[in-house]
Amino acid sequence: MVLIGVLASLLILQLSYSKSLDDGAKESAYDDEIQQSSWGNSTVNTTLTETVVIQLIMGGSECYKSKHPFLVYLYNSAGFFCSGTLLNHEWVLTAAHCNRDDIQLKLGVHNVHVHYEDEQIRVPKEKLCCLSTKNCTQWSQDIMLIRLNSSVNNSKHIEPLSLPSRPPSMGSDCTVMGWGTITSPKVTYPKVPHCVDIKILHNPVCQAAYPTMSRKNILCAGVLEGGKDSCKGDSGGPLICDGQIQGIVSWGRFPCAQLLEPGVYTKVFDYIDWIKGIIAGN
């Protein structure tokens, strides 16, 4: 039944894709050239006419305060730009394209305009991107570890999220969350993080949606009928399946949450040895 569903989805995708080409639309792709948008988030210039926007939560609702103690708010002098995930008392996982010179990290926050008693703020002591300490612009490896300048303490609103013990199953029910825009193409940033439930999509479906995309080290997640997606401002945040971080919000098409256009996530399990080695001091 799963195979039949995948084949049916592929047929729909191919028909839709053929029509889009007939209408003069271009495929989206991404490369290593990063451009800062007016919203303080990164976009990727493509070699084609359509721009891929670094991701953003659509179709969801406010997260319960108690459901995101691992969610980290990344900002600088220009304001909020990304999210991250607390892995232990001194390490945060986010996307490499979220790298900035003056990052600050706020933990234990829900409403960004409210100060919480156990809220803690840190700055990076060390940043490691794309399996290298020197290069943070390889979009095929959109992952970054941030070592905090001092340890954080567990509290009511601060607690790490588990790394994956196995790769995610195709079709798994997962949740993505962040402070990204809740409307698209008009951008509306919420005061509180939003959560939305989506599914890990089969590789053939993902490949049909993005024919030029490399499938290495990435996941596609969303709903094929659209309406639910990560979006502008959600970059670096977690895709959570069965209580473990399986993905990092990376990129997608804009406007978000469109029919047959799922979001793209860095596949955390593919980097598990690197992550554990760094955290262990290797």
Swiss-Prot record:
The keyword Translocase does not apply. It holds the Pfam family Trypsin. Expressed by the venom gland. Residues 57-280 form the Peptidase S1 domain. SUPFAM superfamilies: Trypsin-like serine proteases (SSF50494). Disulfide bonds join 63-195, 82-98, 174-241, 206-220, 231-256. Belongs to the peptidase S1 family. Snake venom subfamily. It comes from Bungarus multicinctus (Many-banded krait). InterPro entries: Peptidase_S1_PA (IPR009003), Peptidase_S1_PA_chymotrypsin (IPR043504), Peptidase_S1A (IPR001314), Trypsin_dom (IPR001254), TRYPSIN_HIS (IPR018114), TRYPSIN_SER (IPR033116). Gene3D superfamilies: Trypsin-like serine proteases. Transmembrane segments: none annotated. Snake venom serine protease that may act in the hemostasis system of the prey. Residues 19-56 form a propeptide. This is Snake venom serine protease BmSP. GO terms for cellular component: extracellular region; secretory granule.
